[in-house]
């Protein structure tokens, strides 16, 4: 008994150290994001006229958006992996991000460019929810993890094809701009998108507080039922929350892959398996990863800005291949 108590205390201290370290790294990454750009602006110059323009009006809203979207995507990946009992589940791989893109493009086509910005965000959320609900239907049919993964990939390909057809045959300038936007990027984010940032915060906080049902869900469907968890209720709540986070993220920054897949895996490999630590850890680590990727996207080329989706795919694809090989052993 004493050994168990000692182990529990050591594990608790270790978890606290992890969360404190990740919180510190978030602060450092945020500081770097605010300073870095075509012009390096040190914190001492933030209150100058130059700092007023570049830091407070341009970089701060972008940094906040990157932070929230990174946290949302990583949390969505962790939730989907528990929800579908599939370690390879993530919004981009299972087509949820592409579903949000289809919803957005449908709104642009049907609205003839006359719809307000908030309605486009809601259409992206609806598209993400639709794909997530379809995937949940497949999961309830007790498909194997490989079949469920293939179903998600197929849905993603269908959504991608629909977007490509719509963009290719469109004469709308707005729709052609969406082709570049769907590669992922925060270049157009300013304080006008603050309502989208605000829409993410309560869902992020709520998800981070649901460690107990998430731990039970991770045990599997049968143990969860035996422990008295109302599976139908929690599945639908988590589907809505995940679809909301992915839809808002896509509406704000386009499709950004691999954050939701790689971050939860890395934290689990580091020993953070309890969702009481894994969920806030994913939010913090996802924010760090996307903040650093955004800095790379801004600074890699002197004359242009790389799509952040390209940066995350370039860094995430090798890790994804390694995870596939590791899971096949």
Swiss-Prot record:
InterPro entries: ABC_BtuC-like (IPR037294), ABC_transptr_BtuC (IPR023691), ABC_transptr_permease_BtuC (IPR000522). The chain crosses the membrane at residues 18-38, 64-84, 91-111, 115-135, 149-169, 191-208, 243-263, 277-297, 305-325. Keywords: Cell inner membrane, Cell membrane, Membrane, Transmembrane, Transmembrane helix, Transport. It comes from the Bacteria. It is found in: Cell inner membrane. CDD domains: TM_ABC_iron-siderophores_like (cd06550). Its main location: membrane. The keyword Metal-binding does not apply. Pfam families: FecCD (PF01032). GO terms for biological process: cobalamin transport. GO terms for cellular component: plasma membrane. The keyword Cell membrane applies. It is a multi-pass membrane protein. One of its GO terms (molecular function) is vitamin transmembrane transporter activity. Part of the ABC transporter complex BtuCDF involved in vitamin B12 import. Involved in the translocation of the substrate across the membrane. Belongs to the binding-protein-dependent transport system permease family. FecCD subfamily. The complex is composed of two ATP-binding proteins (BtuD), two transmembrane proteins (BtuC) and a solute-binding protein (BtuF). HAMAP family: BtuC (MF_01004). This is Vitamin B12 import system permease protein BtuC.
């Amino acid at each position: 008994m004493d050994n168990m108590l000692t182990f529990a205390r050591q594990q608790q201290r270790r978890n606290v150290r992890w969360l404190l370290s990740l919180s510190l790294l978030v602060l450092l990454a945020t500081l770097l994001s605010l300073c870095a750009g075509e012009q390096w602006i040190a914190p001492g110059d933030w209150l100058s006229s130059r700092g007023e323009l570049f830091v407070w009006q341009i970089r701060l809203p972008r940094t906040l958006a990157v932070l929230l979207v990174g946290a949302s995507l990583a949390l969505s990946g962790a939730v989907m992996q528990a929800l579908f009992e599939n370690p390879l589940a993530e919004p981009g791989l299972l087509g949820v991000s592409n579903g949000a893109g289809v919803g957005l493009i449908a709104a642009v086509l049907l609205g003839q460019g006359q719809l307000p910005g908030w309605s486009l965000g809601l259409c992206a959320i609806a598209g993400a929810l639709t794909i997530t609900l379809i995937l949940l239907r497949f999961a309830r049919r007790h498909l194997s993890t490989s079949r469920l993964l293939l179903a998600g990939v197929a849905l993603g390909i269908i959504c991608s094809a629909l977007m490509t057809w719509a963009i290719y045959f469109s004469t709308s300038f707005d729709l052609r701009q969406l082709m570049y936007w769907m590669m992922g990027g925060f270049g157009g984010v300013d304080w006008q998108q603050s309502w989208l940032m605000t829409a993410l915060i309560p869902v992020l906080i709520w998800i981070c507080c649901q460690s107990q049902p998430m731990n039970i869900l991770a045990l599997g469907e049968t143990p969860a039922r035996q422990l008295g968890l109302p599976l139908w209720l929690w599945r639908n709540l988590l589907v809505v929350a995940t679809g909301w986070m992915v839809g808002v993220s896509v509406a704000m920054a386009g499709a950004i892959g691999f954050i939701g897949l790689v971050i939860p895996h890395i934290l689990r490999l580091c020993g953070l398996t309890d969702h009481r630590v894994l969920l806030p850890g994913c939010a913090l680590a996802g924010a760090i990863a996307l903040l650093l990727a955004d800095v790379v996207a801004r600074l890699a080329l002197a004359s242009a800005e790389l799509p952040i989706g390209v940066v995350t795919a370039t860094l995430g694809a090798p890790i994804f291949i390694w995870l596939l090989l590791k899971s096949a052993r």
